[in-house]
Swiss-Prot record:
GO terms for biological process: glutamate biosynthetic process; glutamine catabolic process. One of its GO terms (molecular function) is glutaminase activity. Keywords: Hydrolase. The keyword Protein transport does not apply. It catalyses: L-glutamine + H2O = L-glutamate + NH4(+). This is Glutaminase 2.
Length: 309
């Protein structure tokens, strides 16, 4: 499906782009450091299958932490919330997404929530399959149904770049393994997790996933109930409380919609029952969120009264 370019949306993108100079691309993952910090694109996918866009919405990017919502949805449907939340908590944290502090001081046997790296690693370790390839294929199959795009795959360069530099995540895995949180081989989990984070798509694909969540798990194009209603509700709740790293509270006040960001500069936003939003803007603020993407959502929320609060 081709998005319709929208002049009003383009004007908002132009306005939001002014803050890109204040941000920086993620340099600690070498492959992400190549991005153009001045890029900004947005697609809005409505429940009636109308799509509006501004900027270069065909440009692809990797999901990074946005993938945490999708792996969580998959394992919740596979095992149920009681089992999943016996491994990972449900409470927000004010710490950075890669912090190990709360894991050490609050509850060594359970990461606080699935949106921080420690919790996401545990969730990824629960994905069904005997090998990394089987588990990745299972996740990719799910994401292809969410996007209605069979071409979705992962970026090998980004995955390899992350795998070779993710020492803090490895440390978390070994720390949690010490406490029996998961029994998997650490390198196998790291291999799967870095490939999960490197799953690649464009703003339209991401907006389409957002629209599935907006419709409580039903795909607007195919009509398939891809995610159960209860799991969609749980995931949207986590996006409100933990989706924008340790800026989630401020984002809830200024924008007020469920959203999930990633350090590639992607943001998935959800206007319940109405539409999904896919944004790509690789210049990040100090919290790791797309600086122009957040600004664009602030403008849109104020103009179109998007806040759910």
């Amino acid at each position: 499906m081709v998005c319709q370019h929208n002049d009003e949306l383009e004007a908002l993108v132009k306005k939001a782009k002014k803050v890109t100079d204040k941000g920086e691309v993620a340099s600690y993952i070498p492959a992400l450091a190549k991005a153009d910090k001045h890029d900004l694109s947005v697609a809005i996918y409505y429940s009636n299958n109308v799509c509006l866009s501004a900027g270069d919405v065909e440009k692809t990017f990797t999901l990074q932490s946005i993938s945490k919502v999708l792996s969580l949805a998959l394992v919740l449907m596979e095992y149920g919330k009681d089992k999943v939340f016996s491994y990972v908590g449900q409470e927000p944290t004010g710490d950075p997404f890669n912090s190990i502090i709360k894991l050490e001081t609050v509850n060594p046997s359970k990461p606080l929530n699935p949106m921080i790296n420690a919790g996401a690693l545990v969730v990824t370790s629960l994905i069904r399959g005997r090998t990394v390839k089987e588990r990745l294929d299972y996740l990719l199959s799910f994401i292809r149904r969410l996007t209605n795009n069979q071409e979705i795959t992962y970026c090998r360069e980004v995955a390899e770049s992350e795998y070779s530099t993710s020492m803090i995540n490895r440390a978390m895995c070994y720390y949690m393994k010490q406490y029996g949180i998961f029994e998997d081989d650490v390198e196998a989990v790291m291999d799967l997790y870095t490939k999960q984070c490197a799953i690649e798509m464009n703003s339209l694909d991401l907006a389409k996933i957002g629209s599935v969540f907006a419709l409580n798990g039903r795909h607007p194009e195919t009509g398939e109930q891809v995610i159960s209603k209860d799991v969609a509700r749980i995931c949207k709740t986590f996006m409100v409380t933990c989706g924008m790293y340790n800026a989630s509270g401020e984002f809830a006040i200024k924008v007020g919609i469920p959203a999930k960001s990633g350090v590639s500069g992607g943001i998935m936003g959800i206007s319940p029952y109405d539409f999904g939003i896919g944004i790509f803007g690789p210049a990040l603020d100090e919290k790791g969120n797309s600086i122009a993407g957040v600004k664009l959502l602030e403008i849109m929320s104020e103009m179109y009264r998007l806040s759910i609060f």
